[in-house]
Amino acid sequence: MKFIIKLFPEITIKSQSVRLRFIKILTGNIRNVLKHYDETLAVVRHWDNIEVRARDENQRLAIRDALTRIPGIHHILEVEDVPFTDMHDIFEKALVQYRDRLEGKTFCVRVKRRGKHEFSSIEVERYVGGGLNQHIESARVKLTNPDVTVHLEVEDDRLLLIKGRYEGIGGFPIGTQEDVLSLISGGFDSGVSSYMLMRRGCRVHYCFFNLGGAAHEIGVRQVAHYLWNRFGSSHRVRFVAINFEPVVGEILEKVDDGQMGVVLKRMMVRAASKVAERYGVQALVTGEALGQVSSQTLTNLRLIDNVSDTLILRPLISYDKEHIINLARQIGTEDFARTMPEYCGVISKSPTVKAIKAKIEAEEEHFDFSILDKVVEEASNVDIREIAQQTGQDVVEVETVSGFGPNDVILDIRSVDEQDDKPLKIEGVDVVSLPFYKLSTKFGDLDQSKTWLLWCERGVMSRLQALYLREQGFQNVKVYRP
């Protein structure tokens, strides 16, 4: 099988040296992602496209899906690459490929040609279109808005029969821009802002301020791992977790009620800036939108920025909540965000929307900054690929099994789309489907006399969810890894 990767248009208008660098980086990213599906595949870069050739037909859908999620790709063409002799040969091959698809439909033919030939692209379109119209009685030519467009590409002595076109996410290849650190909370905003910077070519690391215990961190790990696995798995990234409960306690004790929100954000920026400096990261990323909450007025944002020299990027600054939720739905983080436990350790009764710098600084004079230094120093830092192993260490009390007993039921916790694409069927045991994002609200409705064996393809989500359910008091859960 063969795929032709078309570049994001902004890449094609770069200077020659920059364009070549972007294409080289994108080629490497494609190799890094696809090697998990087929180690024998070939990725070949050209000036205006990249070819992907693979042998394992069983991985066709998986490879195609992975390509649509790699930043820097505008669209993917799935093609059949065959030799040809003349225009009539092109027509005959197109007839075999498209006959069934054109029955009872309107169609047109569109040809792109590269190389030296005795015919033009328009001549091929007319010849092939006329031939198809004559040989398929129920088909009819329609040049504007046809039911089917027959796409052909002629390159030297090769004919590319385009079997399908699939849109990519666009943007720049990850690694063409410098690293950033996303302040991720697991909600709608931070997930979308992280995705937007990945799509713009940045390697996105994650920094999480834990205000609500292990359950909150588990949920945020899921979001970060999902974003990385789906859009950024070509690169290694860090997941940094900072226990911010001591900082919140100090704020509650020492800071005036109305100033708490701004002071908390300033503390987070200070801590994140220290982490960014430690790892050589150039900017912070937040999901703040202008006017969304009291701390996100222009005055307050300016005061928050003042505590650090590190650049703070806010890709959602002009977005409304509905737009953000729609984007979260498109990238697949909506369900995470809707079920994410909400923790707010600092809730002001009357938060200021126009903080005064002198007053904020006066309140911060009461704060013991050694507490902030301590939590940053003790922050955990893991390679996001090791989240499964890290979770395995955390879930020491959750048993992992490879078989099942008479009272066991396997619980498939994959998303609905994954379940539909690859239904789980195992002889000798009942299989129940319940997506991971419904476990927190629906698991209690299941038969609690049964032992539930949580299963997902890679085992990451099942371990995370097993720990979460154990913390909620459910002892009848195990992790199933055949």
Swiss-Prot record:
Domain named Rhodanese: residues: 404-482
Enzyme's top EC category: transferase
InterPro entries annotated for this entry?
A: Rhodanese-like_dom, Rhodanese-like_dom_sf, Rossmann-like_a/b/a_fold, ThiI_AANH, ThiI_fer, ThiI_N, THII_Thiazole_biosynth_dom, THUMP_dom
**Which organism does this record belong to?**
Citrobacter koseri (strain ATCC BAA-895 / CDC 4225-83 / SGSC4696)
Q: Which cysteines are joined by disulfide bonds?
A: C344-C456
The free-text function statement in the UniProt record for this protein reads:
Catalyzes the ATP-dependent transfer of a sulfur to tRNA to produce 4-thiouridine in position 8 of tRNAs, which functions as a near-UV photosensor. Also catalyzes the transfer of sulfur to the sulfur carrier protein ThiS, forming ThiS-thiocarboxylate. This is a step in the synthesis of thiazole, in the thiamine biosynthesis pathway. The sulfur is donated as persulfide by IscS.
GO molecular function list: ATP binding; CCA tRNA nucleotidyltransferase activity; tRNA binding; tRNA-uracil-4 sulfurtransferase activity
Domain spans labelled THUMP: 61-165
| PROSITE patterns registered for this protein in UniProt | RHODANESE_3, THUMP
- Looking at the UniProt record for this protein, which Gene Ontology cellular component terms does it annotate, in alphabetical order? cytosol
Binding annotation for ATP: L183, I184, K265, G287, Q296
Q: Which UniProt keywords apply?
A: ATP-binding, Cytoplasm, Disulfide bond, Nucleotide-binding, Redox-active center, RNA-binding, Thiamine biosynthesis, Transferase, tRNA-binding
**HAMAP family per record:** ThiI (MF_00021)
Cellular localisation: Cytoplasm
Similarity comment: family membership: Belongs to the ThiI family.
UniProt name for this protein: tRNA sulfurtransferase
Task: Cite the annotated pathway.
Answer: Cofactor biosynthesis; thiamine diphosphate biosynthesis
